[in-house]
Amino acid sequence: MKNEDTLVWTPKQVVEKFISAFNSMDKNLLDQIWASPCVFMIGNQTNVFEKYSDAVDFNNILESGWKYTKINWIEDRYKSEDICLLRFNFSRFSKEEEEEELNNYTVSHLLRMLGDKWKISALIMDETSGMSGVASR
């Protein structure tokens, strides 16, 4: 049995691990999953952050009533040996007793093979409204 740290995750698994780390608000793991620096292209704005934890504001996200995020679908758009573009849709759900979808987004992640690991390098989103708590500072 392989140690999870030595396992080479596929790009889709990296995005799934990202959502899991996001749900845990684990900034250290998020910084390991994302490349440094990381780029956020939202609408016509581009922001570069030294690390992912600089781009996310969990207090802002929690204030929206957020409890967790779930991937609805994910698809390959392009893949080579060292670059992969994934497009996926996800929903943010509330922390109320009755589960409520707060937001639904479709984004793309550009992943690069850095060393022997896939890392997320960029988020690309068409919507100019962006996402609360992410790259909004």
Per-region residue spans from a language model:
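Short, aromatic-enriched amphipathic alpha-helices that serve as compact interaction elements
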Residues: 6-25, 33
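Hydrophobic/aromatic beta-strand elements that line small-molecule binding cavities or substrate pockets
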Residues: 71-77, 90-92, 106-112
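A solvent-exposed, acidic/Ser-Thr-rich amphipathic alpha-helical stretch
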Residues: 9, 27-80
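A short, structured loop/turn motif at beta-sheet edges
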Residues: 76-84, 98, 111-119
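Short, cysteine-centered beta-strand-loop-beta hairpins and adjacent loop/turn segments enriched
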Residues: 92-102
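Short beta-strand segments enriched in hydrophobic/aromatic residues
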Residues: 34, 90-92, 124-126
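Hydrophobic residues on conserved beta-strands that form the core of alpha/beta folds
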Residues: 71, 85-87, 120
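Short beta-strand edge/turn micro-motifs at domain boundaries
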Residues: 104-137
